[in-house]
């Protein structure tokens, strides 16, 4: 065979090798991807099976509930106060690491009433972030954040889990839920009806006043509409007062101290055509266990359980205070009462770890009493009822899923999944 023929044969052989290699590569990763998706589906099926066969203890009321209920109801009952400045000092002294307020303190009821009633002395835009917020000053120059209402209680937010604007009542519900579950990592929040004309515009700085439209109809009647200043704020989307210029919203007590912002290991891509690695890799947590402190991992698992109950799938970043995780910004919750986005629980079912204290506390509120106690605690709030019955049923349904996932993990890991850190 001449030299030219040998060269042609070599080229053909090389092309065949490349083709076979590419085919092997493609098939390997296709099979791997199919295997990952199959493992996700298998997990979902396993959890459904576990839910159907949950022990009666998860379905019935825990006798210990009544002891916790009475203490909580007493602690969070709003009560009269005399000196707001003293309460501000107490609340600023409360935080320790990520615990924003104590388990029980007689001043809590007074503080809630203070946040609801103290007059607004100054208002300005709070431009940071994607959502409309205002920075208010109450008596004694105490700063608080105000988030206004965008949606009625019964709206169903369609689409992906992070769709829509913030739901203001979700912040109040998160506060009470955190208190019940002893995850006292949220800011203290109360509902409040404010007057857009007399309390916000009248006490607003020039920049805020420039983001409030005043429309006058043919009869000379004024309507005040706020659009504010933020990443997504614009003049086409406004919040308008009613006939008395009132709007609903929530007052969020600003957590004292320095907060550090960190990217969540379970962050979504926020692209419909691209999934994050953790969404398909059920072994994702194995590497995290080697590079993340166990206490931080346990914090994030607590957060995942909390977020799953209220369906907050938008915690792309999380904040820490003194190196412990806090639950800031809970507004993207309670979007669709009919959907349960299981992947919010990924930290739990991928790591199969949970604090023993968290697990014990969850079981106290079995049998439908979790939403019952939050409902009773929030009865004095200005925005009661905070959520609809459909959303309450959703919370109770998801608590059963949490129980089922822990049972699934116990089958895999046994008692070593429970940690005391």
State the predicted function of each range:
Residues 1-421:
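Phosphate/dinucleotide-binding and metal-coordinating scaffold of catalytic cores
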């Amino acid at each position: 065979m001449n030299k030219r023929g040998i060269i042609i044969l070599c080229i053909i052989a090389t092309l065949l090798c490349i083709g076979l290699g590419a085919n092997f590569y493609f098939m390997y990763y296709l099979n791997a991807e199919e295997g990952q998706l199959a493992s996700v589906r298998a997990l979902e099926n396993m959890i459904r099976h576990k839910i159907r066969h949950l022990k009666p203890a998860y379905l019935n009321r825990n006798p210990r509930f009544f002891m916790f209920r009475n203490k909580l109801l007493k602690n969070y009952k709003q009560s009269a106060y005399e000196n707001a400045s003293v309460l501000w000092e107490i609340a600023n002294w409360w935080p320790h690491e990520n615990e924003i307020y104590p388990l029980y303190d007689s001043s809590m009821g007074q503080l809630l009433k203070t946040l609801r009633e103290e007059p607004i002395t100054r208002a300005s835009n709070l431009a940071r972030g994607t959502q409309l917020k205002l920075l208010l000053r109450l008596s004694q120059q105490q700063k608080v954040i105000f988030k206004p209402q965008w949606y009625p209680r019964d709206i169903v937010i369609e689409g992906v889990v992070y769709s829509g604007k913030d739901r203001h009542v979700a912040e109040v519900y998160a506060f009470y839920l955190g208190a019940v579950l002893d995850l006292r990592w949220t800011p203290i929040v109360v509902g409040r009806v404010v007057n857009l004309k007399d309390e916000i515009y009248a006490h607003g700085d020039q920049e805020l006043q420039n983001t409030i439209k005043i429309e006058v109809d043919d009869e000379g009647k004024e309507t005040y509409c706020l659009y504010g200043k933020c990443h997504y704020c614009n003049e086409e989307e406004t919040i308008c007062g009613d006939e008395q210029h009132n709007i609903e919203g929530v007052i969020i007590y600003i957590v004292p101290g320095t907060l550090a912002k960190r990217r969540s290991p379970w962050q979504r891509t926020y692209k419909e055509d691209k999934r994050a690695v953790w969404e398909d890799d059920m072994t994702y947590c194995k590497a995290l266990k080697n590079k993340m402190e166990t206490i931080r991992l346990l914090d994030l698992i607590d957060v995942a359980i909390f977020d799953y109950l209220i369906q907050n799938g938008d915690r792309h970043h999380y904040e820490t205070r003194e190196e412990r995780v806090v639950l800031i910004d809970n507004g993207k919750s309670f979007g669709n009462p009919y959907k349960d986005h299981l992947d919010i629980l990924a930290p739990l079912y991928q790591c199969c770890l949970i604090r023993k204290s968290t697990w014990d506390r969850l079981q106290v509120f079995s049998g439908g009493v979790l939403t019952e106690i939050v409902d009773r605690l929030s009865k004095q709030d200005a925005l009661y009822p905070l959520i609809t019955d459909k959303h309450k049923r959703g919370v109770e349904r998801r608590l059963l899923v949490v129980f089922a996932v822990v049972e699934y993990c116990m089958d895999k890991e046994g008692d070593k999944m429970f940690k005391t850190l």
